[in-house]
UniProtKB/Swiss-Prot annotation:
Name the UniProt record assigns to this protein: BPI fold-containing family C protein
InterPro entries, per the entry: Bactericidal_perm-incr_a/b_dom, BPI/LBP, BPI/LBP/Plunc, Lipid-bd_serum_glycop_C, Lipid-bd_serum_glycop_CS, Lipid-bd_serum_glycop_N
Protein localization: Secreted
Disulphide linkage map: C161-C200
Gene from which the chain derives: BPIFC
Listed GO biological process terms: innate immune response
Organism superkingdom: Eukaryota
Expressing tissues: Detected in the basal layer of the epidermis from inflammatory skin from psoriasis patients, but not in normal skin.
Lineage, broadest ranks: Eukaryota, Metazoa, Chordata, Craniata, Vertebrata
Keywords associated with the record: Disulfide bond, Glycoprotein, Immunity, Innate immunity, Secreted, Signal
Gene Ontology cellular-component annotations: extracellular space
Family: Belongs to the BPI/LBP/Plunc superfamily. BPI/LBP family.
Extent of the signal sequence: 1-23
Glycosylation sites recorded in the entry for this protein: N79, N92, N113, N213, N225, N257, N301, N355, N372, N415
One Pfam family it belongs to: LBP_BPI_CETP
Length: 507
């Protein structure tokens, strides 16, 4: 009996483990894919970054002692200080993905020119001066391992580092340079040996410094006065032969409450493409969490006075006076009134191929306040406003705009043939279209920040709506100097996408 029970218990244990692990699976709200094209461009940009870094970087001092037998000198103590790389060339450099591991860097046939100060001391003499060091046959290979820390920051680790310099030539300058250059060759070998021993530790030190910078990245970004956006990594990068995927949490929180929304992200798969350097998939979950967080914060509640409505009806061909007179005709009003609109549920997000819609369930109240009296409700009813979401990439942000597709009061079908109901529905639709949506679009102008590498700009960007997620395809451009970012407070010249869902980034 006992022998039969043990396999059953083990089976139950394994099933329980599978259930627990599957129930704890976390899917990303944002998925970023780096392709081989990005790595190839990264080699070019990397050279610019290294050049900029080397202008400010001072290498460790190099010192030692050598005997010069041909001069009958027992020892010469030497010290090279203030070592700076003045020029370099790495013509054969490549980056490649190592599936499941990281990114392999390889360079060979490199050269470098180094300037340095030196000092010599021996039983016969001591002196100081300057020197130039030419290095050739530079070879380096190593693998950068990418993981994440407990706070969702990316971390880097150098593995299998191998670096070698094949040749070194020293040229001394100064009054006795002819003398020193005559015995420079015997010193080149120990210099080469010391440099070869220093290279991998120097590179590892730079990776460590880069990790320190990565650990300070803000994975929680304040979007507005109501919400935060979590950009943290939820898992280590997924690496294949052709690309690297970063899974980011991509969820909005109310400013005062970092609790996950009452719904979970669903998995989505980026299409197998390689024409762009970077692909960013933004899941429906990302937008749903933004909707929920703003709803929780009360952002979707608005009250408009007669004067405020007037300011937004200037584009209405019928004119505000005509609309207000129709309302007054129905309710026999002589005093100013207010319109209060409140979302009754978080707006509903729906992403289908070529179509991004936002349905807003809400209630609308017409209010008035006679002199020396409290606010009175004239009428209150529920409605659903269906809107299309227009998209554009402006700078490094995804900017949205809303346009009204349909406005429908929540009434029994039997009442829809009532002429007065239809008139009122049209009036409220006009108020929403010309009064409320312009206010919403003004707030949406600040956009959502898109995560991108430091000093890299998005260029040749394209937006596509697929089932369940938004796909951004873009190339990258490295900016050596910081330029002022475009303003997000002006809409003139923007080609906002309404029906054509594939678009280029704004110029």
């Amino acid at each position: 009996m006992c022998t039969k029970t043990i396999p059953v218990l083990w089976g139950c244990f394994l099933l329980w483990n599978l259930y627990v692990s599957s129930s704890q699976t976390i899917y990303p709200g944002i998925k970023a894919r780096i392709t081989q094209r990005a790595l190839d461009y990264g080699v070019q940009a990397g050279m610019k970054m290294i050049e900029q870094m080397l202008k400010e970087k001072k290498l460790p001092d190099l010192s030692g002692s050598e005997s010069l037998e041909f001069l009958k000198v027992d020892y010469v103590n030497y010290n090279f200080s203030n070592i700076k790389i003045s020029a370099f060339s790495f013509p054969n450099t490549s980056l490649a993905f190592v599936p499941g591991v990281g990114i392999k860097a390889l360079t060979n046939h490199g050269t470098a020119n180094i300037s340095t100060d030196w000092g010599f001391e021996s039983p016969l003499f001591q002196d100081t001066g300057g020197a130039d060091l030419f290095l050739s046959g530079v070879y380096f290979t190593g693998i950068i391992i990418l993981t994440r820390n407990d706070f969702g920051h990316p971390t880097l680790k150098l593995q299998d580092c191998y670096a070698q310099l094949s040749h070194a030539h020293v040229s001394f300058s100064g009054e006795l340079s002819v003398l020193y250059n005559s015995f420079a060759e015997p010193m080149e070998k120990p210099i080469l040996k010391n440099l070869n021993e220093m290279l991998c530790p120097i590179i590892a030190s730079e990776v460590k410094a880069l990790n320190a910078n990565l650990s300070t990245l803000e994975v929680l970004t304040k979007i507005d006065n109501y919400t935060l956006l979590d950009y943290s990594l939820i898992s280590s990068p997924e690496i294949t032969e052709n690309y690297l995927d970063l899974n980011l949490k991509g969820v909005f929180y109310p400013l005062e409450n970092l609790t996950d929304p009452p719904f979970s992200p669903v998995p989505f798969v980026l299409p197998e493409r390689s024409n762009s350097m970077l692909y960013i998939g933004i899941a429906e979950y990302f937008f749903k969490s933004a909707s929920f967080a703003h709803f929780t914060a009360g952002v979707f509640n608005v009250t408009l006075s007669t004067e405020e409505i007037s300011n937004h009806f200037v584009q209405n061909s019928q004119g505000l006076g005509n609309v207000l007179s129709r309302i007054a005709e129905i309710y026999i009003l002589s005093q100013p009134f207010m319109v209060r609109i409140m979302a009754t549920e978080p707006p509903i997000i729906n992403l289908q191929p070529g179509n991004f819609t936002l349905d807003i369930p809400a209630s609308i109240m017409m209010l008035t306040q006679p002199k020396n009296s409290t606010v009175e409700t004239i009428v209150s009813m529920d409605f659903v406003a269906s809107t299309s979401v227009g998209l554009v990439i402006l700078g490094q942000r995804l900017v949205c705009s809303l346009s009204l597709n349909r406005f429908r009061l929540a009434l029994p079908e039997s009442n829809r043939s009532n002429i007065e109901v239809l008139r009122f529905e049209n009036i409220l639709s006009s108020i929403l279209h010309f009064g409320v949506l312009p206010l919403a679009n003004a707030k949406l102008q600040q956009g959502f920040p898109l995560s991108n590498p430091h000093k890299f700009l998005f260029v040749n960007s394209d937006i596509e709506v697929l089932e369940g997620f938004l796909l951004i395809s873009t190339d990258l451009k490295y900016e050596t100097s910081s330029k002022q970012q475009p303003s997000f407070h002006v809409w003139e010249g923007l080609n906002l996408i309404s029906r054509q869902w594939r678009g280029k980034s704004a110029p």
